[in-house]
Amino acid sequence: MARYLGPKCKLSRREGTDLFLKSGVKANDEKCKMNTAPGQHGARRARLSDYGLQLREKQKVRRMYGILEGQFKKYYVEASRRKGNTGATLLELLESRLDNVVYRMGFAATRAEARQLVVHKGIMVNGHTCNVPSAQVKAGDVVAVREKAKKQLRIQNAVELAKHRKELSWIDVNTDSLEGTMKSSPDRSELSADINEQLIIELYSK
């Protein structure tokens, strides 16, 4: 299955909420009509069944993190094997992805941009270059922008944009040296309240 390369607004409108797929330079609601589905005339949203709600929630989270179906299912399987709340563990695994951590630290304006930065070998983890977006970052790991990439305008712009986002307690970022430390596992209370991970668990556990 190929990665979606079409309009980002279309995905957000499909899910009826901002998936944070765009840089945030302009508010998404200026262009994306979240209260209507995609299409020339904005089709009315049908009332969903329980299964439909579960499926939509899964699609929303999968698209938010830019992950294909097969890989997303693997995250669920891994989360279900671990002790504790499966839904919270699933989100922890997603948030601990290297591309997401790069985005959370403010080195990229979007997760897609963060993924590209990682793939192009612009990021180091504990002093070593890592070009695997799905690599799991652990507490104590240091994530930094490589010296040769620090002058990229998109990174400088991303750092400025990140100043307007809420700071997260589980990461510590030095914007001068463009490096950050993952202090602890991601805290569910600081993640989007618009995510209902229990619906995803119900979908996969059938």
Swiss-Prot record:
CDD domains: S4. Signal peptide: none annotated. Pfam families: Ribosomal_S4, S4. InterPro entries: Ribosomal_uS4, Ribosomal_uS4_bac-type, Ribosomal_uS4_CS, Ribosomal_uS4_N, S4_RNA-bd, S4_RNA-bd_sf. The keyword Ribosomal protein applies. Gene3D superfamilies: Ribosomal Protein S4 Delta 41, Chain A, domain 1, RNA-binding S4 domain. It comes from the Bacteria. Part of the 30S ribosomal subunit. Contacts protein S5. The interaction surface between S4 and S5 is involved in control of translational fidelity. Belongs to the universal ribosomal protein uS4 family. This is Small ribosomal subunit protein uS4. It comes from Francisella tularensis subsp. holarctica (strain LVS).
